[in-house]
Amino acid sequence: MANRKKQSKGKDKDSGWEERVVQVKRVTKVVKGGKKLSFRVILVIGNEQGQVGVGVGKASDVIGAVKKGVTDAKKHLVTVPLTKSNSIPHPINGISGAAKVILRPSAPGSGVIAGGSVRTVLELSGVQNILAKQLGSNNTLNNARAVLNGLTQLRTFSEAAKDRGVPIESLYST
């Protein structure tokens, strides 16, 4: 009992992953004997180097819900292609349910201009210069998933050149 290891809240020391809880919600289920209380946790996990995931965990206590959320987030990891200025290669829209998120690259030094869960997902993915706008819904989970949807659609210049069958230099000429 004396040699218990302390667990870090934010970063995993061995792998460099950081987790942030976006929302803790107390939910109820009506059963025959009354109401059963449980907690739903939405969290984002990322290594700030181009990998990020969103997870949801439900349990009777918050700690159990967070653990389930971390395992769920690790199952839904997305790799983000970052530019040299730590932005995204091109503008993109992401959709999840009624939530629509517009993501646009911005100039170096402008920072992450976004709100709510969108900001958390973008920061943990390693994007440092971006403009984002939420449209349609204020739902935390749907907006976070909409960002992931948009980030999965991103393509690098080399991927676009390969798909078109042209040399990459032709994409840069005016």
Swiss-Prot record:
GO cellular-component terms in the record? chloroplast; small ribosomal subunit
Q: Could you confirm whether the keyword Zinc appears in this record?
A: no
Query: Which InterPro entries does the record associate with it?
Result: Ribosomal_Su5_D2-typ_SF (IPR020568), Ribosomal_uS5 (IPR000851), Ribosomal_uS5_bac-type (IPR005712), Ribosomal_uS5_C (IPR005324), Ribosomal_uS5_N (IPR013810), Ribosomal_uS5_N_CS (IPR018192), Ribsml_uS5_D2-typ_fold_subgr (IPR014721)
Transmembrane parts of this sequence: none
Q: Name one GO molecular function term.
A: rRNA binding
Pfam families this protein is in?
Answer: Ribosomal_S5, Ribosomal_S5_C
Which biological process terms from the Gene Ontology are attached to this UniProt entry?
A: translation
> Taking every annotated instance into account, which residue ranges of this chain make up the domain S5 DRBM?
17-80
Keyword set for this entry?
Chloroplast, Plastid, Ribonucleoprotein, Ribosomal protein, RNA-binding, rRNA-binding
What NCBIfam families does this protein map onto?
Answer: rpsE_bact (TIGR01021)
Q: What is known of its domains?
A: The N-terminal domain interacts with the head of the 30S subunit; the C-terminal domain interacts with the body and contacts protein S4. The interaction surface between S4 and S5 is involved in control of translational fidelity.
Assembly and binders: Part of the 30S ribosomal subunit. Contacts protein S4.
Cross-referenced PANTHER family: MITOCHONDRIAL RIBOSOMAL PROTEIN S5 (PTHR48277:SF1)
Relate the protein's function as given in its record.
Answer: With S4 and S12 plays an important role in translational accuracy.
Family classification: Belongs to the universal ribosomal protein uS5 family.
Q: What is this protein called?
A: Small ribosomal subunit protein uS5c
Native species: Pyropia yezoensis (Susabi-nori)
